[in-house]
Amino acid sequence: GTDRFELYRETAGLGGFDASNVAYDKLSSGRYYRAADGDTALGFYEGPNFHQTLVFNQNIVATHRWNVEHQSSLGYNLRYDEIYSNVLGGDFGDVYLVPGWDGYTMDKGASTTDFSFFVEHKYTRERVQVTAGAMLNYHDVPTGDSSYFFAPSLDVLYRLTKDASLYATANRSMRYPTYTDLYYNRGGAQGSLDLSPESAWNYEWGYKQKSGQVYTSAALFHRRSKDLIDWVSYAGDPIAYASNITSLALTGIEGGMQYNATKRKALLRNAVVQAAFMRGVTPEVDFSSLYALDYLQAKINARATQRLGLGFFLNYSITLQDRVGTYRSVGGEEVNYDPFALLDFKLYYAPAGGIFKRQFPFQAFVNINNALDAAYYDRGNVIQPGRWVSTGLEFRFR
């Protein structure tokens, strides 16, 4: 199928709603106009974005156990994807009609081929388990340039007891630019065909334990990234540019505790507490980062499910979050992200015997997200949704 993205609502009645009061119409001049209040869309807007994608993926893995202690695996992954669009990609000469949308065409496109070969060996003896592996990746980008990437990995596990263990991991990872990063050029955003893949070395040391119905974990981690892909803007320039910006070193700790009841009639079905704290080191820069440098320096989440009786249950969750960095206000000022707290609830009815006397799992629910109606920003100068109430039914057939 074809994806359609509207910056301004143009189609009245989508989703069963009467949108005649909010829909924009295209004038003969090419501008978009809303008759209900006389509002005119921004001048750069030329209509909805259409994207049609095709993805082929093949993955083959072979594993051989040599004996009780040694096991080897090797395999490869092949991925090919292409996109046809009216926005993303290079001009390919031909013009295609957008299926199901009269009057719209796509005249741009691009494709990528990604091939990975990997090998891994696992050694297990008594309390020790060591896994070492490596991946060689070939990536053919839309510009015709190709690149190779080598990613080794090492995992070590030591069992202190039957239910407790220490572990350490080290690996290298990478991320290639998306079609949006490469080609998007509308509304004050400019992609770049000169982007390089970003890469990172990741290290983690941790502890895991299970004691009865309680799971506990704690870890120390470190990540060193370079050639980060980000959208950046400079003082006095309204354009956001896709760029490989800089390096970033993140060091942090995370931990959590989880309780799962073994009996359905338990008053407290489950409870989870998770926390993560990190600090970053990066060179001084003369631009504003959209997301790569604006990392979460603190996040705490606690959630639980409580049985109320008669088939009713209540989920509640509280999240505390503190993000570093800034965003640019409508007036062009740099504004620091403020910490915020979110409270969410879910009340649902799920009878143990299902419905229709057929043991079909059933759930009727009401969700209340951001119950305290907190006003906050999380990414860029976009205020996040306030209190959001939704309801629905869920059936599972087996």
Residue ranges and their predicted role:
Residues 1-145, 159, 217-220, 266-274:
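Face-selective signature of the C-terminal outer-membrane beta-barrel domain
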Residues 2-4, 78-84, 125-127, 134-140, ...:
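Transmembrane beta-strands of outer-membrane beta-barrel pores
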Residues 41-49, 61, 100-107, 137-143, ...:
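Extracellular loop and loop/strand-boundary signature of outer-membrane beta-barrel proteins
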Residues 273, 323-327, 347-398:
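C-terminal beta-signal and adjacent terminal beta-strands/loops
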Residues 58-64, 117-123, 154-158, 205-209, ...:
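Residues on the lipid-exposed face of transmembrane beta-strands in outer-membrane beta-barrel proteins
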Residues 69, 123-129, 222-224, 243-328, ...:
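Gram-negative outer-membrane beta-barrel transporters
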Residues 106, 110, 145, 159, ...:
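Outer-membrane beta-barrel signature, preferentially recognizing the C-terminal barrel domain
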